[in-house]
Swiss-Prot record:
Gene Ontology CC terms, in alphabetical order: centriole; cytoplasm; nucleus
Naturally occurring in which organism (per UniProt): Sus scrofa (Pig)
Key words of the record: Coiled coil, Cytoplasm, Developmental protein, Differentiation, Nucleus
Residues covered by region (Disordered): 1-23, 189-214
Entry protein name: Coiled-coil alpha-helical rod protein 1
Name of encoding gene: CCHCR1
Chief location bin: cytoplasm
């Protein structure tokens, strides 16, 4: 611009140079010694722009240096142009330094905000870690409770199976012993009847020659046979009556056999059911407490969100960057809160599922208790049936024993009469 305008004469006067060094402004100490690459590019471009001007000035001075009249004026003109360019360059550098200072201040504020944001995020992550740890501990507790309930259920099943097998084994042993005793009694009675028949046949064969003496004995034997047939008919009638009585006893007699064992088992099952119901009530109470916690956290988060929104309202309309960052921070805070609420809801649903599963186990145990009660009633009825059958067999054996004693008494009388008849014949 100096080459196109007129230059006043005072511009060519000699100016004294300052002897004291210039002091740097106080804001220069805040500028870092190492400039960013962008600033170095700006200085290099400025130095490149100055180089062609200095080269042109040297060419003009060398071209016009031969003229003696223009030499002094051209030197002063070139010096003034160089000074004006240096002043303009210094002003540009000062503007650039002020701009760099403003950028440094903005970067410091940004780094401070980022530091505060990182601290808040670290606190949020720590709170989330504590919540996750608490949720894991609660899940482990529920898994332990379910494992305990499963162990109790398996123990109940094993105990019921062992008791049922023991009852069946005892019933089978008792039935086999009763059958064996009945067979032994029948074989002994058959053997005794065979012996009696043999003794009667031998007596008839030996006394066949004495018809008169043995006629009475034959009549008595015939009478004995008739009595035996009548006894057999009476025995069959008694067996029929015993069968009817057994059926009547199986229908009318109340269950009293092994009642104490089944009552203790029933009491144990009722205690187990009561304990599971108490566990269910405890889990229900825990679910209600978790619901209260969720509501409290929701209320607290709403209050904190309102307070945060009130604090981050922009006081100056010339700060859109700060407002945008605050809005982004508020948005992230809402996302974290939503994730925490989703996690709490998932824990609540899982807890509810565990409670429903425990309810199903309690219902299954109650149904099994009822089924075992019905099986117990059936076994009691069958035991009563077997007891009545044993009693009938005992009565049958007693009747047969009485008949046998009567037959032996008749035989003894017949032998006595035979002996008396022999003595009379000898006389």
């Amino acid at each position: 611009s100096g080459s196109t305008r007129l230059i006043p004469p005072s511009h060519f006067q000699a100016r004294p140079h300052p002897t004291l060094p210039r002091m740097a402004p106080p804001w220069v100490s805040d500028i870092p010694l190492v400039q960013p690459p962008a600033h170095q590019d700006v200085l290099e471009r400025l130095s490149d722009n100055q180089r062609p001007q200095v080269t042109m000035w040297e060419k003009e001075v060398s071209g016009k240096g031969q003229e003696p009249g223009w030499r002094g004026r051209s030197v002063e003109l070139a010096g003034s142009q160089a000074l004006s360019q240096q002043a303009e360059l210094i002003s540009r550098q000062l503007q650039e330094l002020r701009r760099l200072e403003e950028e440094v201040r903005v970067l410091r504020e940004t780094s401070l905000q980022q530091k505060m944001r990182l601290e808040s995020q670290a606190m949020e992550l720590e709170a989330l870690a504590r919540a996750e740890k608490a949720g894991r501990a609660e899940a482990e507790g529920l898994r332990a409770a379910l494992a305990g309930a499963e162990v109790v259920r398996k123990n109940l099943e094993e105990g019921s199976q062992r008791e049922l097998e023991e009852v069946q084994r005892l019933h089978q042993e008792e039935l086999s012993s009763l059958t064996q005793a009945h067979q032994e009694a029948l074989s002994s009675l058959t053997h005794k009847a065979g012996g009696l028949e043999k003794s009667l046949s031998s007596l008839e064969t030996r006394r066949s020659e004495e018809a008169k003496e043995l006629a009475a004995a034959q009549r008595e034997a015939e009478l004995l046979r008739q009595q035996l047939s009548k006894t057999q008919e009476a025995l069959e009638a008694q067996v029929t009556l015993a069968e009817n009585l057994r059926r009547y006893v199986g229908e009318q007699v109340p269950p009293e056999v092994h009642s104490q064992t089944w009552e203790s088992e029933r009491q144990e099952l009722l205690e187990t059911v009561q304990q599971l119901q108490e566990d269910r009530d405890g889990l229900h109470t825990t679910a209600e407490l978790l619901q209260v916690r969720v509501q409290s956290l929701t209320h607290i988060l709403c209050i904190q969100e309102e307070e945060l929104a009130r604090k981050v309202q922009p006081s100056d309309c010339l700060e859109p960057e700060f407002t945008r960052k605050c809005q982004a921070l508020l948005k992230r805070w809402r996302e974290k809160v939503f994730a925490l609420m989703v996690q709490l809801k998932a824990q609540e649903l899982e807890h509810r599922g565990c409670v429903e599963q425990l309810k199903g186990q309690v219902a299954e145990l109650q149904e099994r208790a009822e089924t075992q009660g019905q099986e117990r009633a059936i076994l009691e009825r069958s035991l009563q049936d077997k007891a009545a059958e044993v009693e009938v067999e005992r009565m049958s054996a007693k009747a047969l024993q009485i008949e046998l004693s009567r037959a032996q008494e008749a035989r003894r009388r017949r032998q006595q009469q035979t002996a008396e008849a022999e003595e009379q014949l000898k006389l």
